[in-house]
Swiss-Prot record:
Organism expressing this protein natively: Campylobacter jejuni
InterPro entries referenced in this protein's UniProt entry, alphabetically: Epimerase_deHydtase (IPR001509), NAD(P)-bd_dom_sf (IPR036291)
Role: NADP-dependent oxidoreductase involved in the biosynthesis of capsular polysaccharides. Catalyzes the reduction of CDP-6-D-fructose with NADPH to generate CDP-6-D-glucitol.
List of residues binding NADP(+): 34, 36-37, 56, 60, 94, 96, 98, 167, 171, 197
Family (UniProt): Belongs to the NAD(P)-dependent epimerase/dehydratase family.
Keyword DNA-binding: no
Top-level EC class: oxidoreductase
Reactions listed under catalytic activity: CDP-6-D-glucitol + NADP(+) = CDP-6-keto-D-fructose + NADPH + H(+)
Known partners and oligomeric status: Homodimer.
Name under which the protein is recorded: CDP-6-D-glucitol synthase
Entry's EC annotation: 1.1.1.-
Lineage: superkingdom: Bacteria
Residues the record lists as binding CDP: 100, 164, 212, 224, 226-227, 233, 296
Keyword terms of this UniProt record: Capsule biogenesis/degradation, NADP, Nucleotide-binding, Oxidoreductase
Length: 335
């Protein structure tokens, strides 16, 4: 296993071992287990719980997890949800398209994939009397709500003529389905609304903005901004996302929604680019002539994450640690 990941796992177990042990021996289904967050959950829970990983491509999952951990023992990997015969205790539904280009080029597929997969997971959970379902959502569901204290009850609006909104609208209707199944069928469910995750194991071809910066800096010796970079938001380390989800897994409430963010990492896209450029010793340049219709409009948004903090959770990684580990990891695995 990569040394960065070894150190992080040790830190997590030293700080959150009690909560990790609470779900020891549970049978946990993780959808999208070869994705950014799903793979970290798999890494952390591997060896503590019995894991069932649902993915689109089993071979890619094996390659991904061998890169991260080097050991796929005690993990059952499936491409078909309905081939899982064992009694599942907990479902963590991570699977969803995450690429902005895909949302714009395939808006109908985006909505269909997110909604249909969520409904299938809910039907599976109802049929199998699952103890807990956790649905990963996004801060994007707040729509046009901006400000410094956005709570889980805030509601924004979306333009139905903006194709890019296929993603948050699909997540929003899926949240509605999660709550409806909880109410109608007495399923214990939770929704976690995530801000942007950062940290090691992000893949080199990921199109998140910070990966564009890092990739450009490594390959082209400069970072190019196609907007003024005025959007300002919170970021959170992917390992902190995973531990927050573990805390939610341990809760017995029938239904709850949690904002998940690190209030200490609140930064504009421009300042993030400058921070990364300083670490890689490159320049930031602007190219404001490109079509930016695929980007969200500029905004400033800070989530109120009081609920998750009240469970006793706290993030362990600051911006510098997240970026340093991410850059080092990318360089090591792509040598």
């Amino acid at each position: 296993m990569n040394e960065i990941l070894k150190k992080r796992l040790k830190l997590l177990k030293n700080n959150f071992g009690t909560h990790i042990n609470k779900i020891a021996n549970k049978k946990i289904l993780i959808t999208g287990a070869n994705g950014y967050i799903g793979s970290i959950l798999t890494l952390i829970l591997h060896g503590n719980a019995k894991l069932y990983c649902l993915v689109r491509n089993k071979d890619k999952m094996i390659d991904r997890f061998q890169e991260i951990c080097g050991d796929i023992d005690k993990i059952d990997i499936y491409e078909d949800l309905y081939k899982i015969q064992d009694k599942i205790d907990i479902v963590i539904h991570c699977a969803a398209p995450t690429q902005s280009d895909f949302f714009i080029e395939n808006p109908i597929d985006t909505v269909d994939i997110i909604y249909t997969n969520t409904k299938n997971i809910l039907d599976f959970s109802k049929k199998n009397n699952v103890e807990k379902i956790i649905f990963l959502s996004t801060m994007e569901i707040y729509g046009d709500v901006i400000g410094d204290n956005i709570v889980e009850d805030d509601i924004g609006k979306f333009s139905v003529t903006n194709i890019r909104n296929s993603y948050p609208l699909a997540k929003q209707i899926s949240e509605f389905m999660v709550h409806s199944y909880s109410k109608k069928y007495s399923l214990s469910t939770a929704i976690v609304r995530l801000t942007q995750a950062i940290g090691p194991t992000a893949q080199i071809n990921d199109n998140r903005v910070y990966m564009d910066f890092i990739r450009s800096a490594i390959k082209k010796s400069q970072i190019t901004l196609f907007t003024k970079g005025e959007t300002k938001r919170e970021y959170i380390d992917v390992f902190d996302v995973a531990t927050a989800i573990i805390f939610v897994m341990c809760e017995k409430k029938m239904f709850e929604i949690y904002n998940i963010s690190n209030p200490n990492i609140f930064i504009s896209i421009y300042d993030l680019a400058k921070t990364i450029s300083a670490k890689l010793n490159v320049q930031v340049v602007f190219d404001l002539q490109r079509d930016t219709s695929q980007y969200l409009p500029s905004f400033s948004r800070r989530l109120n994450s009081k609920k998750i903090y009240q469970l006793g959770w706290t993030p362990l990684f600051d911006l510098n640690q997240s970026l340093d580990d991410m850059i080092k990891y990318i360089k090591e695995v792509n040598e």
